[in-house]
From Swiss-Prot:
EC code(s) of this entry: 3.6.1.66
Protein name as annotated: dITP/XTP pyrophosphatase
Lineage: Bacteria, Bacillati, Bacillota, Bacilli, Lactobacillales
Reaction(s) this enzyme catalyzes, per UniProt: XTP + H2O = XMP + diphosphate + H(+); dITP + H2O = dIMP + diphosphate + H(+); ITP + H2O = IMP + diphosphate + H(+)
SUPFAM superfamilies per the UniProt record, alphabetical: ITPase-like
Task of the protein: Pyrophosphatase that catalyzes the hydrolysis of nucleoside triphosphates to their monophosphate derivatives, with a high preference for the non-canonical purine nucleotides XTP (xanthosine triphosphate), dITP (deoxyinosine triphosphate) and ITP. Seems to function as a house-cleaning enzyme that removes non-canonical purine nucleotides from the nucleotide pool, thus preventing their incorporation into DNA/RNA and avoiding chromosomal lesions.
UniProt-listed Pfam families: Ham1p_like
Record's cofactor remark: Binds 1 Mg(2+) ion per subunit.
MF-aspect GO terms: dITP diphosphatase activity; ITP diphosphatase activity; metal ion binding; nucleotide binding; ribonucleoside triphosphate phosphatase activity; XTP diphosphatase activity
Binding-site positions, substrate: T8, N9, N10, K11, N12, K13, S73, F157, G158, Y159, D160, K180, H185, R186
Active site: D72 (proton acceptor)
Subunit record text: Homodimer.
């Protein structure tokens, strides 16, 4: 096989992976759910990032009969017992509404001092081969930081304006794309995936 399905509707994410694979001389065509006819909607009912990534990868690999990459990411705040966690995208009550999500996060942390606002951004990536779900390739990435009391930066995506990385002295939203990718949870998980995918892929094809 020379096609990888990325279980997402985000073409930019698929393009990012395809370009990265070309750079390591593993030129696989990456498509998304938008390239399929009537793809199923997968409910993310898992209680962990790994469970949700596996749900999406398995369902879409089964539907498409293609090797499938799925990911799940989120923010876990220590003071909130790990919330928003797997509910990060819809924490404010409406899916992918960054303003509502950030407003709720700030409200939940109202009055909490800076030294108690630690948090972790997490990404899990899973690649599944059709009919071989016991052989999933799994990579993960994490980065620690803290939640500010007000947003900073122009990169207005998700919780990035509130997530401050002390070692860099910046929020994710204040970093360039390259700066963020070099240290981010997603960047870590993707680099691990790229390191392992060619060998795993060939093994799946030959068994």
């Amino acid at each position: 096989m020379d096609t990888l399905l990325f279980a997402t509707n985000n073409k930019n994410k698929a393009r990012e992976v395809e370009e990265a694979l070309k750079k390591i001389n593993f030129p696989i065509h990456v498509i998304t759910n938008q390239d399929l006819t009537d793809p199923p909607h997968v409910l993310e009912t898992g209680t962990t990032f790994l469970a949700n990534a596996k749900l999406k990868a398995h369902k879409m690999a089964e539907f498409s009969n293609l090797p499938t990459l799925a990911d799940d990411s989120g923010l876990s705040v220590d003071k909130l017992n790990g919330a928003p966690g797997v509910h990060s995208a819809r924490y404010g009550g409406e899916a992918h509404n960054d303003a509502l999500n950030n407003a709720k996060l700030l409200a939940e942390l109202g009055g909490v001092p800076r030294e108690k606002r630690q948090a972790t951004f997490h990404t899990t990536m899973v690649v599944s081969w059709p009919g071989r779900f016991d052989d999933d390739l799994v990579t993960q990435g994490e980065i620690r930081g803290e939640i500010l009391t007000y947003p900073r930066g122009d990169g207005d995506f998700g919780y990035d304006p509130l997530f401050f990385v002390p070692d860099k002295g910046k929020t994710f939203a204040e970093m360039t794309v390259d700066e963020k990718n070099a240290i981010s949870h997603r960047g870590q998980a993707l680099r691990k995936l790229l390191a392992e995918l060619p060998t795993w892929w060939k093994k799946m094809e030959n068994e």
